[in-house]
């Protein structure tokens, strides 16, 4: 009889525990799936909010060895127009390439340039055996989103991609060609600057010329 009472008590405790589990309130007002979809919608809308596109400052590789590269992107609903300061096999600097993109929720909210295009995928493709090339990404995770700036990191290698909106009167080709003119007009690889009496070394990537001291008052 005593054993029957114990078993009955245990059965009641199990039923009460199960009831509590099913009646537990969600901490959030929305489900995780709803929150993920809301984040996708927010990021998708933000990408399309820049009327003349975004300046994309892209830093490929695992460190500073490649420096940064400038692209411009204008996002539509499912396509993006891209232009780059770089020249590829089929696109001159400043020439526009149109390709597909998508915003999805997987490991966070992601921007994926999954349709092959030279301007993005040139940073991701190896140059040959045991040569990772620029060691870049074509899938990026949103880290912060606003109308003034969007910051993303590469999904595989953690590359940094910073986007800021272009002014309405900016001509894409003139802007990117202007960047290339600055690089062409800088004939030295390393500059020694004196700022407030302190010597600072400024290095320019991919230019192999001797050092020249410059004094800035």
Model-derived features: positions:
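Beta-sheet ligand-binding and adhesion/scaffold domains
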Residues: 114-185
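Acidic/polar, low-complexity intrinsically disordered N-terminal segments immediately downstream
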Residues: 21-110, 168-193
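Solenoidal tandem-repeat scaffolds enriched in leucines and small polar residues
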Residues: 197-204
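Nucleic-acid-binding small beta-barrel platforms of the OB/S1 family
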Residues: 106, 113-116, 212
């Amino acid at each position: 009889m005593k054993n029957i009472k114990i078993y009955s008590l245990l059965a009641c405790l199990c039923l009460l525990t199960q009831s509590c589990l099913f009646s537990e309130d969600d901490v959030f007002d929305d489900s995780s799936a709803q929150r993920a979809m809301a984040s996708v919608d927010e990021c998708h809308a933000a990408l399309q909010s820049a009327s003349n596109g975004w300046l994309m400052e892209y830093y490929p590789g695992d460190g500073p060895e490649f420096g940064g590269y400038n692209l411009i992107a204008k996002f539509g609903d499912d396509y993006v127009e891209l232009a780059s300061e770089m020249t590829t096999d089929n696109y001159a600097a400043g020439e526009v390439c149109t390709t597909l993109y998508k915003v999805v929720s997987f490991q966070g909210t992601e921007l994926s340039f999954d349709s092959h295009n030279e301007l993005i995928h040139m940073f991701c493709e190896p140059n040959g055996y045991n040569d990772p090339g620029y060691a870049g990404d074509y899938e990026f995770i949103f880290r912060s989103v606003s109308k003034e700036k969007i910051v993303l990191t590469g999904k595989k290698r953690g590359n940094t991609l910073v986007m800021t909106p272009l002014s309405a009167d900016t001509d894409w080709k003139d802007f990117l060609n202007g960047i290339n003119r600055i690089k062409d007009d800088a004939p030295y690889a390393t500059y020694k600057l004196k700022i407030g009496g302190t010597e600072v070394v400024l290095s320019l990537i991919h230019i192999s010329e001797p050092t020249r001291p410059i004094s800035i008052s």
